[in-house]
Amino acid sequence: MKMILTLLLSIASFYAVLVLVNLPAPFVGLEFESGETPRLWFAPPGYVIPIVWFVLFTLLGIGRYQLLQTGQAPYQLWLYGLAVLCAAYAYYTLGLAKLTHISALWFGLTGNIAVIAFALFVAWKLFPVSRPAAWLTLPVVAWTVFASCIVLGEMKLEKLI
């Protein structure tokens, strides 16, 4: 029972990161457009994106649990750092676009590259101490690479590249 509770609390802690980081966003004028039809054939409908992040943050929580089970608790900070970077997407895309009047797509692409690089670094740091935790980090890379393809497609449609 204690193991299940630890697992659930690990997962819940990553959901808390997602919520707490994004709670101020609407109060500082950052809003994602919803209900917009994707313009690219491979872009998922808008409602899919929060579901994917729900799954990815669940995997990060399971990764934390793996670290706790192997006595490598200090390494969980790498996972939390990655979670904060991922959750801060609205701030480094929409927020910077609002401040600079430069397309959010540029900031999205730059941010995605940073997320990919940091997620790979985190997986590399975790691999020697917990291979499952390292592997559970890699879906963030896969999703963010896919999201970057969407951003690049949108940039092409907007004639930014």
Placement of each model-derived feature along the sequence:
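N-terminal membrane topogenic signal
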Residues: 1-11
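Terminal transmembrane helical module of multi-pass membrane proteins
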Residues: 124-161
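Hydrophobic residues in alpha-helical membrane-spanning segments
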Residues: 25-27, 51, 140
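Alpha-helical interaction segments
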Residues: 4-5, 42-44, 133
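Alpha-helical transmembrane segments of multi-pass membrane proteins
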Residues: 11-30
